[in-house]
């Protein structure tokens, strides 16, 4: 089914090479290495791989064994992303995770000797009843394991989840700010560079898949619940998502919805993505990815500069610290009235 789903896009991508593959959504590490190898071979048979393709697979620390990791590397996986979330067993239980802190550390040890080019640890802060010291202790333990990449997210309560029905006591805004400020300092001192709102990496280890997404690049969506974006030769931009129901997917009902990104919405969508990254925004990329000229946003840009939301050079726009604090107001400037 994944192969048939992929086949539908072959004509649309005009033989463009793949620069990254992200195998996520649940626990793909339950797949055998043989299955992953087969999947990647089928993708490569249809779409060329770039020379330094990054192939990331999500893994649950509770489902990892040494042989499996080595098998994934042999199959072509270059990077593993592990959903650690916390090193505090009480907090992990509260989050409904199936692993404990000892298993998480064991999984990291295996990742280090498996031949992977890189690996990421997903960590959360702002957990129920979490103190500043507990949050920083999680970070210290993560830093000690020396992952090349760390994703450090604040817990958000999603609708229709256990926490949405029975809201826990979460740290207040002041406590969250202290956690972020002191945590950011810990990470920086340990040699990690923040390159996106929630992502830190050692130099040269940024996640290419992340970068492409936040730079408003294209990505295919293959499999249940996947979301994608494609730009066509005529300049049209299509966003699409796949059915969330495995039964429907197995019946060949792949597509859930698709919509064209109208020209009026492109500036907003572009900046909403780009301003998540800390790097400067090349003006040429605005034109390349949106198909719009810079003059289309001149008034909004001038106002944003006046408000100290961004600074401008001949070739770049850069969001300021002030702009990050007022991101919603900055983005609202680009909304189509």
Positions of PLM-derived features:
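Short amphipathic alpha-helical interaction segments
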Residues: 291-305
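C-terminal scaffold of the Radical SAM
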Residues: 1-11, 16-292
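Minor-groove-contacting beta-hairpin "wing" of winged helix-turn-helix DNA-binding domains
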Residues: 316-321
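A short, conserved structural fragment
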Residues: 305-315
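Short, amphipathic alpha-helical interaction segments positioned at domain boundaries
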Residues: 322-337
């Amino acid at each position: 089914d994944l192969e048939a789903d992929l086949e539908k896009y072959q004509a649309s991508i005009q033989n463009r090479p793949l620069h990254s593959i992200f195998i996520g959504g649940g626990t793909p590490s339950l797949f055998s290495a043989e299955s992953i190898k087969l999947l990647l071979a089928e993708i490569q048979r249809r779409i060329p791989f770039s020379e330094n393709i990054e192939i990331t697979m999500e893994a649950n620390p509770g489902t990892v064994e040494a042989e499996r990791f080595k098998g994934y590397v042999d199959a072509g996986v270059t990077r593993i992303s592990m959903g650690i979330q916390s090193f505090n067993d009480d907090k992990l239980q509260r989050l409904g995770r199936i692993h404990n802190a000892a298993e998480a550390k064991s999984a990291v040890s295996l990742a280090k000797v498996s031949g992977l080019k890189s690996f990421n640890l997903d960590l959360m802060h702002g957990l129920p009843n979490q103190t500043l010291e507990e949050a920083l202790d999680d970070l210290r333990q993560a830093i000690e394991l020396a992952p090349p990449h760390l994703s450090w997210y604040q817990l958000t309560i999603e609708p229709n989840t256990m926490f949405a029905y029975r809201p826990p006591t979460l740290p207040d805004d002041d406590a969250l700010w202290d956690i972020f400020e002191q945590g950011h300092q810990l990470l920086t001192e340990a040699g990690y560079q923040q390159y996106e709102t929630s992502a830190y990496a050692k130099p040269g280890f940024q996640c290419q898949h992340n970068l492409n997404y936040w730079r408003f690049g294209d990505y295919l969506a293959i499999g249940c619940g996947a979301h994608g974006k494609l730009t066509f030769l005529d300049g049209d931009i299509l966003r699409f998502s796949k059915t969330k129901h495995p039964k429907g997917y197995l019946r060949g009902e792949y597509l859930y919805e698709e919509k064209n990104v109208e020209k009026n919405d492109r500036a907003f969508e572009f900046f909403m993505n780009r301003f998540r990254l800390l790097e400067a925004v090349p003006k040429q990329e605005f034109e390349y990815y949106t198909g719009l000229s810079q003059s289309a946003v001149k008034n909004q840009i001038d106002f944003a500069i006046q408000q100290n939301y961004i600074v401008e050079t001949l070739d770049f726009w850069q969001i300021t610290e002030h702009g990050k604090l007022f991101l919603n107001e900055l983005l609202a400037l680009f909304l189509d009235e």
